[in-house]
Amino acid sequence: MATATKTNDVVLEINNISVSFDGFYALTEVRTKVMRNSIHFFIGPNGAGKTTLLDIICAKTKPTSGTVIFHPKGREAVRLTGMKEYKIVREGVGRKFQVPSVFVNLTVEENMILSLKGHKGILDSIFKKPSKEDMESIRSTLERVGLEDKASERAGSLAHGQKQWLEIAMQLVQKPEIIMLDEPAAG
């Protein structure tokens, strides 16, 4: 027997998303709901539109039609479609890209500090000192992903898989309500 989905259990709604690139439809009327505290996978061959869907959710690509609705816990639903990328991140939607995006000339810890949620601008990132709570969160997150002994090393010296874990840690320390991983085991 099927049970009805409670709206407060849904964290992300994808409603009839289509995207066309010069007449070629990469996605056609994709619909799904992502439940809070769950793991979902989009599986398909190369070119199936998995990354394109994540790009639409994060506003990297504009859909031809459809909407993406985010349901943050304890707040009103937010229409992500049409928002700017940085505003989506501030709402609590995290994304780890297929190719690691870390600052290779900074240490692992410095990368983590830059990704802290409270550091919202260039000047904050340069001049604002992280709190003791921030540093504890960084330490525990690095421990969680197995990089605690690499905190003072330059990110560029890490192996590819360690860079993947660093980028995941950079998302986790922001405490997003949802995190999307694009090919996290690639490479």
Give a label for each model feature.
Residues I43-P45:
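The feature captures the beta-strand-to-loop junction immediately N-terminal to the Walker
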Residues T81-G82, T141-A159:
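Conserved ABC nucleotide-binding domain
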Residues K175:
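Conserved catalytic motifs of ABC-family nucleotide-binding domains
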